[in-house]
Amino acid sequence: TKPRLGAVGRSAARAFAQDYRKLCERLDCPPVSFYADSYRQAASSAASQSKLLLIYLHSPLHQDAEDFCRGLTSAQFQGFCRQRFVLWGADVRSADGHALSDSLGATRFPFLAIVICDEAGEKVVASVHGAPSDGDALVATLDGALTQQRGVLQALRRKQRARQEARRLRTEQDRDYQEGLERDRLREAQRQAE
């Protein structure tokens, strides 16, 4: 499924990131770094880094919210995510967070969605409803979801490598063309000077 997420704005993401940091201070645990800009910017960042987007929908009224947030601070979770994901979150009480929750079909919380982002758009490849709060269990759950989507992810990486190679070739061709124009200009100037 392809979520319609363009309207989820910067203010919802920044408010969530700020509230999350405050919660972590209160819980006396180091916060994980959430991308504090619009969904669109987070998706663009994930695509440019050849990473996946991991969306966390936070429901502070849910009984497991604090334990889950504590699990996000585990060294295992942070190390796992640093290599694979751009993390982005929203509070489901905000209008944007609620709209995103509806768009993604979140039925239980905590909720996570793994999204592939490229120039063709975004595609949810896995979601976790009622995610575990323990860092190790959370990593195992996400790793299992990634394993199930291995073929899709490998195809994405091949496409990204092909695009990068095409971009590199285009840049090289543009540079060669500009150098050729400069040589022609210098020859013409030299010919006219003679």
Per-range role (PLM):
Residues 18-22, 67, 76, 99, ...:
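Exposed alpha-helical structural elements
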Residues 1-3, 49-50, 70, 189, ...:
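Intrinsic structural disorder
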Residues 30, 48-63:
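Short active-site neighborhood of thiol/selenol oxidoreductases, capturing the structured segment around
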Residues 147-194:
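Charge-rich, low-complexity alpha-helical coiled-coil segments
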Residues 39-45, 64-148:
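Thioredoxin-like thiol-disulfide oxidoreductase module
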Residues 56-57, 89, 114, 183:
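Hydrophobic side chains in beta-strands
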Residues 1-49, 144-160, 167:
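N-terminal leader/targeting and pre-domain segments
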